[in-house]
Amino acid sequence: MARAMNRLGVRPGLSRSDFKLVASGGFGDGCNSYTHSMAWFRNRLYVTTMRNNFALMRARLSIGLHSWPVETPADPFELDMRAEIWAYDPLEDTWNRVFKAPMIIGSHGKPIARDISFRSITVFQSPGDPHPCLYVGTWCPARGPGPLILRSEDGIHFEPTCEPGLVGLPVTTIRALVPFKGRMYTTPAGSRGGNTNVSGHAVIYESRDPAHGGWEPVSDFGFGDVENKSLHEICAFGDHLYVGTLNNNGFQLWRSTCTGPAPYEWEPILERGAWRGPLNQIALSLTPFKGALYIGTGIQGGGIDKQNDIGPGAAELMRVYPDKTWDLLVGTPRETPHGFKEPLSGRGPGFDKVFNGYFWRMCEHDGWLYMGTFEWSSVLAYVKRSKFTGAFGRVLGYVGPKNVLDYQSGFDLYRTQDGENWAPVTTNGMGNPYNMGLRTLESTPYGMFIGTANPWGPNIMPLDGDEFVFNPRGGCEVFFAPSTAQNR
């Protein structure tokens, strides 16, 4: 039976019981770690994957673990690193893998995956396109030629539209693809040194016809600030294109109408992490909702940036209005140049949960704003105890790592109608503690899809074991909830 609106004309929000699991175990391959992006195209849901995330982390990061949680070779590229694109037909309840990245010869003379992830996907119609097409931003290995933007007219055949590195830039990934005013905008990111977020070229690029390349820079490098290590996230809101940065002194938020001669005029809206400083290192997610732009923050590395000695710190949420005024919604009360700000929700960083290192993705659906987190407590059991001192170490020793994994771990998903009152949908990764993050949300005519980041596969080291075993709950997952008008 249809789920009726209440007397105020408000459609009820989704609850945990509304969601069903439609893909598990990394689409049958635990090496598929992240659902890195989603798009609705031709009555199907398209989901892109990133593979073997823990293997890549082991190769470039030292994070003080007494044993590595996932079985990985010394060289991650001994694994099949080729990213995939999957399509889901909700009427037939069927998945099909429509694309898998090809192998190429890397700069070291050996075969490697051309694409280890597809970090962005969107629907756009270029002037020469016969109809709206899929555009996909890739992530290439450091030994590859550079990232590409792929295009597909039919959702099956994907072809490059630009030279490697967009225009030959020294970057490794295309992080965002955003249509605005009939043009496409992107942010090249990543560097050859292995830093996936810091950009070798922190500039916004624009194309009026991305089917044929035509990319041109439309901003100064880092908006004129060398501390803006990447232009991390882009979002169209009203008459402006907004850009959030990664800055070790705290993110900045900029906007432009993208009119007049390039490079366009850009104006600053927020700085120094909305005056929280380094603990708001990145403007990680930007989403319009009911007349304001919502901003979720984070610290790279899931809430602890070992390279820059930032964190641990939990994420904050704020909103900015077109007149440049802003509210703190979830976070730490503080003085700012715009007066004293306290969280209107009454909740501290991370919704009072220190492990929520990212407010990673947001999505409006049926009049509600949904926000998912990255929650890192599942790693605690593998961290050397000497890393934890003081009260936190004592509490962890008392509770025990297995209890943390069983009862604490897994991403959170919250929803709100006004930005101030939030209700939890799940606080345990939809019942799977290995679902560390909610990486993607997509509102569709049929309902809402969510996709997870779950790098705990295929084989893991059990907390009480001494050899790797298969993890049936490892690998990314996708859940679906019908629109509330269709529920019950």
PLM regions with names:
Residues 44-48, 133-137, 183-187, 240-244, ...:
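Conserved beta-propeller blade signature
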Residues 126-127:
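Calcium-coordinating acidic loop motifs
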Residues 2-33, 40, 44, 53-119, ...:
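Trp- and S/T/G-rich repeat-edge/linker motifs of beta-rich repeat architectures
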Residues 454:
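Short, well-ordered, aromatic-rich surface patches in folded extracellular/luminal domains
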